[in-house]
Amino acid sequence: MKWKWKPNWKEMRRWKKVALIAVSLFILFQIPFIYRRIRLGNLRAAIQKVNAERVVDESASAYTDYKGVVHVHSSLGGHSTGNFVDIIQAANRNGLNFVVMTEHTSDVMDTSEMTLKGVHAGVLFVGGNEVNTASHDRLLLAPGSAEAATANTVGTQQVLANQKARGSLSFIAYPHEFTSWDLSDYDGMEVYNLYTNTKKINYFVTFFDSLWSYRSYADLMFARFYERPNDELKKWDELIAAKNRKVVAIAGNDAHANVGFQLGDRTGKRLIGVHLDPYERTFSVVRNHVLIEKEKPLASETLLAGLASGHCYIAFDLFGDSTGFTFSAENSQGRKIMGDEIELLDGVRLIITIPVQARVLLIKDGQVISDENGASRKEFPVAERGVYRVEVYLTQLGTLVKDKPWIISNPIYVR
């Protein structure tokens, strides 16, 4: 005789009813997150397809494309738990060519001098600082200096002047907080900051996403909250127009490796814990690609010169390797690249090459003047002076990222 359990709802105790309803609702609640996990799997497959389709003719350019990250902190300046070994290993595993450290300052030591510098494991490191000025502005200084520790006692204008006198670079950090827009001695600005973007995370939704997706797709969960930095890009376009001069755009990884929890011994050895923003993951999301003439080596001087000139572009390489992207201009006298000025003369031809077919936006003085999909090379005749830049989108990756930039170029200034 077989015994079968036939639950009788009327005879079931109240707590069992509540428990059964709760379990049923919980299971139903998971369905959207299971679907979201499937979509991340599809995104991974689409990214792999994009990378497999890449075509790059390195001989067609007089420049070498070096990729790296800017705005990185270690435990040296506080606000971070990361150490030098973590950073070096993360950079190496990501295949980076350079890392610009931006240590917070200290009253007892020159953190720009004490941080990573030179070449480690094949990666070039530049020692810099992030500072808060007495004007309540924040700047990235590269290279940094011992003087950076006093930045909070003087105004932004003095900090910028001191940096320029040393022949060093200054970039506006967190432009949504910056107030000294009347000044002009900065070299550029962060038009994208990863930490700022993470503030848009819905932590309730992300918690349940993590239950299903974190183990397999922790990096691609970024696609859920990544947004085009509309306000920063608009401010950048307006700034160039108002100042009538070059303003270089960079992306800040703002890597701290300080999100998560752990239990460990007094030596710092972790016994158990979860690390939500390891350097290796942060370095994979967004990079700055700097173009350096092929006959010149990658060194601190050539890297900083490339950044200062705007010979660089921002790429969200998490969605596909952008190496090989070029944006140049030709007139009857020669060729220039992004960051350069070129005379209109009898006309200019803008040339865009991309490693894969993509959607290409050509933007003049902040306004889109061309929007074409499915192109890997585009040429545009130009008959008007203006500031021209490019945004590239990978529409083939699907709805999660198709409307979010893959590449943001620096401008070509047609004079």
Predicted features, each with a name:
Residues 2-45, 50-62, 243-249, 253-415:
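C-terminal functional module detector
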Residues 40-213, 226-236, 242, 247, ...:
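A metal-dependent hydrolase metal-coordination microenvironment
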Residues 202-227, 262-279:
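Charged, glycine/proline-rich intrinsically disordered loops and linkers
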Residues 67-71, 216-219, 270, 287, ...:
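General secondary-structure edge motif
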Residues 95-97, 126-130, 152-155, 198-201, ...:
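Short, surface-exposed, polar/charged, turn-prone segments marking secondary-structure boundaries
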